[in-house]
Amino acid sequence: TLQHSPPMRIALIGGTGAIGAGLALRWAKDTDHEIVIGSRDPERAREAAADYQQTASEYGSAAKVTGFENAMAADRAEVIILAVPPYHIAATIEAIADSLAAGDILVSPAAGLRRDEEGFHSRPPSAGSVTQLAADVAPAAVPVVGAFHNLAAGRLAALDTPLEVDTLVVGDDDEAVRTTMALAAEIDGLRPVYAGGIGVAAEIEGLTAVLINIAESNAEMADLGVRFR
């Protein structure tokens, strides 16, 4: 059984976007962690944070949600979620690198995709996966974990909707993986499943294209997720 982690500060870099919003809302509703929203525009971050805190409070949560410019948000947190498009990952890590301390954890949920008339396809970066790219760019003392790739943002943000989905977690640092899995498990209805090291991240990121294609082909599956049994 995963232990619930002690109260932490979780930063969502790019936290005004859809996946950042969904994760922020779930953690604010279901946990007592402090949620820090990061954006290149601090005013947008503050507005989003106030909105998320208000929404969570309607579910009885006393969560603290604050908003800052990305580097300041990263400086305030121990776990930093890179909720940015894959083509911004490297520049985002470089922009916050001076705010990262040894032992902080970077979590990458992004997947490289391309779209044509047939649908979505996996398009990993030259590093092999977005998670590997993040690990290549991150400071040496800051472990990177891949998680939350295959979650539907709409389902996350719909707080009345039970999640009942799994998230695959990859990483090479055991403690960072354990911490990330514990944080994931604290979201009601979300089950983290360890899937191996960063070397297999490309396969997991590629599932995102499969899920989007299924969702776009089946109206009743707009916010589908995966469960492993």
Question: Where are each of the predicted segments found?
Answer:
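NAD(P)+-binding Rossmann beta1-loop-alpha1 motif at the extreme N-terminus of oxidoreductases
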Residues: L2-Q54, E186
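Short beta-strand and adjoining strand-loop segment in the mid-core
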Residues: G119-A127, Q132, A158-E175
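Rossmann-like NAD(P)-binding element
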Residues: K64, F68-I105, G112-E117
